[in-house]
Design a protein with these regions (language model features):
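Predominantly a Rossmann-like dinucleotide-binding segment in NAD(P)-dependent oxidoreductases
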Residues: 1-78, 203
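Non-transmembrane alpha-helical segments in soluble domains
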Residues: 3, 58, 87, 166-170, ...
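Glycine-rich phosphate/pyrophosphate-binding beta-alpha loops
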Residues: 51, 76, 99-107
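A general structural signal for well-ordered alpha-helical segments in protein cores
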Residues: 53-54, 165-167, 193
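Glycine-rich, aromatic-lined ligand/substrate-binding cores of catalytic
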Residues: 66, 74, 85, 90-94
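A short, glycine/Asx- and small/polar-enriched loop/turn
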Residues: 79-83
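C-terminal glycine/acidic-rich active-site capping loop/insertion
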Residues: 90, 112-184, 206, 212
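Short arginine-rich
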Residues: 192-202
Length: 212
């Protein structure tokens, strides 16, 4: 529904976008398997746990122009980051940030996106973007009155998206439908992730697209 509002240009000029992923992964989680928390086999809070939220940066808001990131290993005994912050400028001129940590006490707290524009403000929160918490636009639509009926409860921070994804893959392979995403969309997210890591290591702003 948020994607629909963006496509309908209900926000007018996009001003600010913020994504928060405040989850927890104790040291015991990483100790369960040798590959967890490694560069070679896993990736950190950005590449692993928050990767789908990175997807939202381009899928919802559009092409990114610049990324400035800081990452750190603040508490866990792992190779990769347990916490990261990103400052982002989109080609549209919108500014935003992404805050990710796997150190939230005592349990998973929030997976959210807030979009602020010239004519509208929306926050989709909950533990895994499963609750529309704020929905205000100057230009009303019929579907606004039922908007909060889209909310649902989930026991998992990953929601139920995996089941629907695999169903789409199977249906596509059987020729019954079209794919909901493709490799090009995945590359956009991967490029953003690489830019964040490059920025974190260099301390500099990294512009997109990257040289390939």
């Amino acid at each position: 529904t948020l994607k629909r509002a963006i496509l309908e240009r209900r926000f007018g000029k996009m001003y600010s976008v913020n994504i928060n992923v405040f989850w927890t992964r104790p040291q015991e989680y990483y100790n369960q398997a040798k590959w967890r928390g490694t560069w070679a086999m896993d990736g950190g809070a950005l590449m692993n746990q928050a990767s789908h939220y990175v997807d939202l940066l381009t899928w919802l808001i559009g092409p990114i122009a610049d990324v400035h990131a800081m990452t750190g290993i603040l508490a866990r005994d792992i190779e990769v980051e347990d916490t990261a912050v990103l400052n982002i400028r989109w080609r549209s001129g919108a500014l935003g940030s992404m805050n990710v940590t796997m150190l939230t006490y005592p349990k998973n707290m929030e997976g959210s996106i807030t979009v602020i524009g010239e004519k509208g403000t929306v926050k989709v929160g909950g533990v895994a973007v499963n609750e529309i918490q704020y929905w205000e636009f100057s230009n009303k639509r019929d579907y606004d009155k039922n908007i909060f009926k889209n909310n649902y409860q989930t026991d998992s921070v990953y929601g139920s998206g995996h089941v629907r994804y695999y169903k789409n893959v199977i249906d596509t392979l059987n020729g019954n439908t079209d794919p909901e995403t493709d490799g090009e969309e995945g590359l956009k997210s991967l490029e953003t992730l690489i830019a964040a890591y490059l920025s974190s290591r260099s301390g500099k702003i990294v512009s997109l697209p990257l040289d390939r």
